[in-house]
């Protein structure tokens, strides 16, 4: 079972919108040097839903190849339809992913539970890989409640994990109701009060440019050093607040700027056109990180 910090890898793009292979490989090495416990590819931060199936396969191949089995890779393969999801899942399995992430089939968000379960069952049957439910109702319009999650696990034994992107209040219900062979990860940054009660770790986008800090936090919690963990959690919370505030004000180009601050020249992110972060906003953000002791 996976535990720890699984990084939601961003997919960097060239100016023409194609996948920037060189920078993506650089990002993988950056995360491996930080000793993260795994990579979560092509979810929301990975821009999977904004890419074609061909592009998603290409990005998955790059990530898995560059990782070279040095850390587990979960590839998110979810789409609005079952055949394409299966196509991406089969590809991920063939290339060496250890598991797949699957968001419920979005757009038709009035689908009954039976249709959602059928979708997940068909995907699982096609690949025989561990399946991680991607619970992200903000973007997909469908929520997998703890009760539905348990029913899905009963009918689909290959379900082995879940990323709960926006359900902090229900985290302990997921942990309590799922059997022990299901790892529950939070998409939030505040894990101090969750890991001691069974949450397996974090898959948090805003902090993905400071993986060392996240790994330190996880390790301190895992060994029960709660004094150190409390200090690290405050830093992680500060990072999250600064990044989210800038995303709300200036858009997702903020994310590219955070990586540039770490020496990784992300040319284009997100996939779509977005105004660059104003120089004064970038300087202010960097100053805030420096004042908090997060970056030099």
Task: Describe each PLM feature range.
Residues 122-126, 137-240, 244-247:
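Catalytic alpha/beta core domains of metabolic enzymes, predominantly
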């Amino acid at each position: 079972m996976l535990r720890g910090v699984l990084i939601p890898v961003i997919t960097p793009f060239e100016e023409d919108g194609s996948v920037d292979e060189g920078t993506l490989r650089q990002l993988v090495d950056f995360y491996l040097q930080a000793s993260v416990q795994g990579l979560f590819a092509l979810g929301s931060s990975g821009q999977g839903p904004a890419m074609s199936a061909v592009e998603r396969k290409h990005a998955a191949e790059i990530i898995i190849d560059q990782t070279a089995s040095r850390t587990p890779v979960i590839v998110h393969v979810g789409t609005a339809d079952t055949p394409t999801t299966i196509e991406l899942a089969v590809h991920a399995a063939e290339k060496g992913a250890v598991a797949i992430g699957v968001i419920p089939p979005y757009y038709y968000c009035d689908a009954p539970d039976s249709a959602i379960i059928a979708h997940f069952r068909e995907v699982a049957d096609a690949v025989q890989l561990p399946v991680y439910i991607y619970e992200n109702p903000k973007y997909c319009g469908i929520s997998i409640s703890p009760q539905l999650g348990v029913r899905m696990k009963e009918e689909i034994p290959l379900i082995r994990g879940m990323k709960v992107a926006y359900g902090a209040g229900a985290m302990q219900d997921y942990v309590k109701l799922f059997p022990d062979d299901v790892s529950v990860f939070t998409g939030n940054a505040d894990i101090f009060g969750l890991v001691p009660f069974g949450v397996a770790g974090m898959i948090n986008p805003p902090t993905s440019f400071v993986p060392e800090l996240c790994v330190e936090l996880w390790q301190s919690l895992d060994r029960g050093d709660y004094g150190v963990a409390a200090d690290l959690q405050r830093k992680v919370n500060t990072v999250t607040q600064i990044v989210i505030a800038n995303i709300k004000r200036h858009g997702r180009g903020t994310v590219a700027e955070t990586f540039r601050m770490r020496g990784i020249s992300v040319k284009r992110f997100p996939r779509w056109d977005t105004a660059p972060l104003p120089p004064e906003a970038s300087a202010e953000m960097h100053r805030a990180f420096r004042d908090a002791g997060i970056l030099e």
